[in-house]
From Swiss-Prot:
Its main location: membrane. This is UPF0761 membrane protein CBU_1578. Keywords: Cell inner membrane, Cell membrane, Membrane, Transmembrane, Transmembrane helix. GO terms for cellular component: plasma membrane.
Amino acid sequence: MTIYRFFKRSAFTLAYIYRRFHEEGCAYRATALAYTTLLALVPLTIVAFTLLSFVPAFQGVGVRLQNLIWENFVPTSAGMVAAYLSQLTQNVTGLSIINIFFLGIVALLLMYNINRAFVAIWHTEHHFRLSLHFLIYFMVLLLSPFLLGAVMLLGTFLVQSPLVTDLIGWPYLGKGLLFVLPYVLIFITFTLFNWVLPSAKVKLSHAVIGGLVTTVLFELAKFAFTVYLKFFPTYRVIYGALSVIPIFLVWLYVSWTIILLGAVVSNVIACGIPEKYK
């Protein structure tokens, strides 16, 4: 009887999560975020590279940070986008302050749309003016490259320390750490999404569960996406050399769908299921 009740409750929970995902229009929001991300990706990268270039200690950190993101958050099949993005960011030295300012506006709009999607899922309202929100987004955009750059430098320092070098040198422990570390990075990223972006007081435990669900689904999607493109190269046959654009756009849509689904999971765990749906 206990097992039956467990499966029954799990079925109701999954059904309600699907219902909430549909009612909040997450599929449509994922579509909008995918297009916005595609448009804002280059501006975000250029702004980050420009800010990091002002600090001599961060020379070369931008490229390493970019490679870290591409290696962990994009399937191998869509990795050609990284090469195109690297070529585009090489033109950053030829941009004026005004051009960089407008690129920053595009990046701010992406941050605003992401925040609005999480706010809609959690049914929270902003209590500040729109101008204040964009000021907050601007501060985040301004400080994030330096914080991430500092984390990269700290990580490099730790990896080169004698203790970590000895641990990595161990036959099984070293390989285990190198295998687990990318998943931990992805898990922390998605947990922070669910903890910070809803503009509400979210318990860390609820954000952790949502981050864990998102991480598992994200990794499964990466594997399935790579397998699909390998054995069913439809986009490459149709679009040829231009296939990198629709392939990457589809991956962005899948990614945002999973991220928003994780946000719904966090919200359902935090707020529970209403009696009328039980």
